[in-house]
Swiss-Prot record:
Family listed: Belongs to the complex I subunit 3 family.
Gene Ontology CC terms: NADH dehydrogenase complex; plasma membrane
UniProt cross-references to Gene3D superfamilies, sorted A to Z: NADH:ubiquinone/plastoquinone oxidoreductase, chain 3
Name the UniProt record assigns to this protein: NADH-quinone oxidoreductase subunit A
Organism: Burkholderia multivorans (strain ATCC 17616 / 249)
EC number: 7.1.1.-
Underlying gene: nuoA
Annotated localization: Cell inner membrane
Pfam family, one: Oxidored_q4
Keyword terms: Cell inner membrane, Cell membrane, Membrane, NAD, Quinone, Translocase, Transmembrane, Transmembrane helix, Transport, Ubiquinone
């Protein structure tokens, strides 16, 4: 296997990584550094902070975020499948139906366990 065709990709990654690290380092070294209580305080739309920024969040917010990611990934798989359905034929159709069935079974399990209830 000839890996010479991948040298431009490797060069691109090395130059991009090196340039990124160099520019961030130069900015840190040469940029002004004048820490202040006001600068380090969390910004809340121009108002004084109502409470500490490190407050506890309800676990349900994280559950909603994880469920959103799952639904988003499922949609990300559906769009290319729909575009390529004519080319992939019946095996691709059956594979996606199995994927959707697994997804729907997981969704039903979450629903049955009360993961979608907001009480």
């Amino acid at each position: 296997m000839n890996l010479a065709a991948y040298y431009p990709v490797l060069l691109f990654l090395l130059v991009g990584t090196g340039l990124g690290i160099a520019l961030v380092s130069i900015g840190k070294l040469l940029g002004p550094n004048k820490p202040d209580v006001e600068k380090n305080a969390p910004y809340e739309c121009g108002f004084e902070a109502f409470e500490d920024a490190r407050m506890k969040f309800d676990v349900r917010y994280y559950l909603v975020a994880i469920l959103f990611i799952i639904f988003d990934l499922e949609t990300a798989f559906l769009f290319p499948w729909g575009v390529a359905l004519r080319d992939i034929g019946w095996p691709g159709f059956i594979a996606m139906m199995i994927f959707l069935l697994e997804f729907l079974l997981g969704f039903a399990y979450i629903w049955k366990k009360g993961g979608l209830d907001w009480e």
